[in-house]
Design a protein with these regions (language model features):
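An extended, acidic
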Residues: 9-128
Length: 128
């Protein structure tokens, strides 16, 4: 994987408590938002699937959760994630299905399970 002719290094795995994560607060309920905010170092949301995901790919964010992607939103990110040893799954930790769109997470290995645990705790992942 390359950016501007320079090979990308595998991002360092950052524990969730030390990581900036990206998710859209407008589509998640308060319980989920507070759980993610409390567990992480900070929250930033750019609002572009590609721009939020590239922050994970470059090691600047620990995770990005997208709740309404289209197939073209996930293809390039998936290739980078595969090449760099990142995790990219559905929110129930299943392989992505490129024939349809659906919520996904791209993250480093240290954040993945903990973010999914928060998203799926209680009554499960909730959209307002």
């Amino acid at each position: 994987a390359y950016v501007n002719g320079k090979r990308l290094e595998k991002p360092e795995s950052i524990d969730l408590q030390d990581a900036i994560i990206s998710f859209n607060t407008l589509v998640m309920n308060d319980e989920t938002i507070h759980g993610l905010n409390d567990a992480s170092f900070s929250h930033r949301f750019i609002g572009s699937c590609g721009l939020d995901s590239i922050r994970v790919i470059k090691g600047q964010f620990g995770a990005h959760v997208n709740t309404n992607p289209k197939p073209w939103d996930i293809a390039a990110q998936f290739l980078f994630a595969s090449e760099l040893g990142l995790k990219m799954t559905t929110l129930d930790n299943m392989e992505l299905d490129f024939s349809k769109a659906g919520p996904f997470i791209i993250s480093n290995n240290a954040c993945h399970e903990e973010v999914l645990g928060i998203l799926n705790s209680g009554d499960g992942y909730k959209i307002q």
